Amino acid sequence: MIMKNLFITLIATFISVVTFAQKPDPNFHIYLCIGQSNMEAGARPAEQDKDFNDPRFSFIAAVDMPSMNRKMGEWYTAVPPICREGNNMGPVDFFGRKMIEVLPEHIKVGVINVSVAGAKIELWDKNDYKEYIDNERDWMKAIVEQYDGNPYQRLVEMARIAQKDGVIKGILMHQGESNSEDPLWPERVKKIYDNLCKDLKLNPKETPLLAGELKYEEQDGVCWRFNRDIMPRLPEVLPNAHIISALGCESTGDQFHFSTEGMRLLGYRYADKMLELQGFKEVEERTLTLDTKKLGIEISPTLAGIFFEDINQSVDGGISAQLIQNNSFQAYNVPFNTDSDEFSKVDTVFFGWTIINKEGTGKARTVNDRPLVKDLKPLYDFDPDDEYDDSKKYQQYSVRFDVEDPGQGFGIAANGFGISEYVRGWGNKGMYSNNTQIPSIPVEKDVTYDLGLYLTGDSYSGSFSVYLEDKDGQVNSNVITISNIGNDWKKYEGTLKAERSVDSRLCIVADAAGTFYLDFVTLVPEASQLWMEGKYGPFRKDLLQALADLNPTFMRFPGGCASEGTDYWGQVFWKNSIGPVEERIGFRNHWGYWTSQYIGFYEYLLMAESLGATPLPVFNNGVTCQFAGHKYVAPLDTQEDRDRFQSIFVDDVLDFIEFCNGGVNTEWGAKRAAMGHPEPFNLKYVGIGNENRGEAFWDRFDIIYKAVKATYPEIIIVSTSGAADAGREFDENMKKIDELYPDTIVDEHYYKGDDWFYTNGDRYAQGMKRGAQGNTYDRSKPTRVFVGEFANNRTNNAYASTLAEAAYWTSLERNSDMVVMAAYAPLFCKKGYNKWNSNLIWFDNRGMWRSTNYYYQKLFSVAGDRAFEMTPAMEGAVADSTVYMSPTIDTETGEIFIKFVNSECVNKTFTVNIGNKKVYNVSVEFISSFDTKVKNQGDQNYYSSHPDYNKVPSFGGPGAAERPGLREMAWRFAPKVKYTEAIVPHTKEYRKVKKSFDFIMPENSVGIIRLTPAK
């Protein structure tokens, strides 16, 4: 009896132990994972990922992995691969690692990953999977066969094993590329979700499904519309579904897959959401309350504008659509700069041109004894007795050819605006525009190009062939033949149609011996390629469209320092830039390269008009750039000096005002009309000087100021506070303005770093001290501020600079009763020509990259006409100091605009209390990036004409020349430049709202909320 009772006790104990062993551990959280190739995992581990071996994160092998001694149905520490052999890392890996990093140490995480590359969602449909897979590709069938032909069933089987050890807490999914145009995808997902809940006895209310977005368009994703059009319906169909953003997740470079860092960020976002749902991560909640009845200041209607300066090769080779560099051969003519690396030093080297000699003999050189324009009249009365030989400004150069034997052709080729290597400064090599020998004219297939050139001869009897040619000497267009050129200059015109989209050069080749001259060669794309089809001048279409998208209200031009010049020869005189292009006087500009003035002041006025922007020209006042050594100051010592100053510098401003606003019966108004614009340009502003200081400047400023006020009292003059935001120069200039020129708009410039922009948001607030003299920005006085140049220039347009600048911009708008204008600087930079490392728009010969600074300027370019009262972003009873905002309202339409910056890497859920009973349509447009080091323009050496991207790809092997298509294939796989931008705006539309609405302010974001009254 005793033995029997002991046996029963032992049996009961055994049963109890077994029962206890089989009881699931509530602290072992299990997640089911399905999807396509990104979920399957193809990212190579980074160095930081390789030593992971924490048993708190494990997985059940859903297939055998014999090479790793892993058996299906058993648990292993989650050392990749965790899906199948041959995989790497994916979002599931990073999800689990982030989870155990945040969760209490007693909680473990397990995953089951049954994903199949390329598969439609139908593969996980327990009823219809077989019909789907039977019609799929063999390689996919082979993957599915590892799951015994039924991935859904394998997932359920593995989940049941897992349920013996832990508790299923959710489902992770990344699928959709193969269903990217399937409007029923949300319903298909719900069906699978419902089946899993039923088969595994899961409570849907306690089992969230997290679905990750696909690659965005800016990451070259081809399925981005799925994120916009289909995926948002999933939470509507499946209430416990949550969308995980892929915004900013880095790409591998193909159309579908994320890189390791992209996978990491996506996996962390899955984890953040799951932790939030489980209460392990605090939801960042904020409130915002509007009171549109309490109106504030009037918002300056001219606050957002642009500053266009000829810097970084912005004009020739930039906004100018004329494709021939040094088209008039004047770039040889650079007085006082013959030692410059950037210009030809001898008359047989042609800046940007290459001699063509096909087995012939001859010579070519620049000469100035055969001027294209006879009796070119100087428009300024320069002193003939001073140290400068002003006749050099007006010398005209052409190329003389003396052909002894043409061989197969003797002539010259224009290479366009390319680059070549040169040594800058202290032995530093750079890529610049010196004597470009690389064919760099960016022609497009089937586009026609309007050709113009001038020829004359000394009884020359031969003909010329004009055509496009690629770097391999292959003709890339039709051939224009010119004959019987005569002994007088004559313009020849024609059209060339490109056969291939390859960088080319323009060849002008003679076929006979003799002497002839060539001058003023132009090549301009057909009207369809020009801004507004050329109606407003020969401007490059894409670059001007980018400016138009900024909605600029004013345009300052042509500088900056470029308006002053570094020395006597670099001064800008507008009269030399108008009239027939053949008569315009080029010069070496402040930034060290040749300015042809093919785009002159008249074209700048047209440009501003086409953009809907008020022109704001800046004039040289006889003091060259003081930062560049103060090399020239126009003399005022004698009456003759003063008269000459009047005729050159004072009259230059007065005559330009007449050119812009005068009637057609005035001298300069008539010239405007003759150029095709009888209507006035309605000039309102004139800038005198730039970042100037000291007595020499203010004496000359005073003369011009008084002359303009006496003749055109309606014109508003822009003065200057100098080159810094504070300091002795700033204080002295502001004192001078306070005392003598209070009716001017003072132009302030500053280039700073993140901290300055974040901490100076109250710079223009009422009552704040201005400089060291104790004065304030007093609204009761007429002086107003133009922030004519500003930028966060410490990080080369990294996204961090955008967050800081945008935060500062909200303060400019909040104080736009004082700050009436503001403009980022510089506006443009051509890659390979950068004189400045932070620029709003980067471009090359074929495309552009808009910086994230550009995009916040675009988002913030719209506003209402009045500010109104709004609470700060409140976190409970405390204002969030990392959120910067500016609210305005259009008092006529009732539309509300709220600009915002979230400078913290945290998503914040806002409840916005509108404060009235109206119904609104709400949209939020924003940019955001987890990584604040991202630069939209990428590497400085990443552009189309750079040698690394402009090589002839190698191909060869036996019979290579006879193999058609081999060359084309080599080009196809050669390195190419892409014009994608990592960070671009996205829009979230809301249904009609009333009284209040919720929205998520993304991490590190800049955006604008628009509330439009519903009709």
Model-predicted segments: where are they?
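Aromatic/acidic polysaccharide-binding cleft in carbohydrate-active enzymes
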Residues: 248, 257, 302, 310-311, ...
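Solvent-exposed strand-to-loop "edge" motifs in beta-rich extracellular domains
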Residues: 454-459, 497-499, 862, 901-903, ...
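Extracellular and organelle-lumenal recognition/adhesion modules and their flexible linkers in secreted
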Residues: 283-596, 614, 631-644, 695, ...
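The substrate-binding groove and active-site-proximal loops of carbohydrate-active enzymes
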Residues: 80-89, 140-148, 176-183, 257, ...
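Conserved SGNH/GDSL esterase-like catalytic core that processes O-acyl groups on lipids
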Residues: 66-162, 180, 218-220, 399
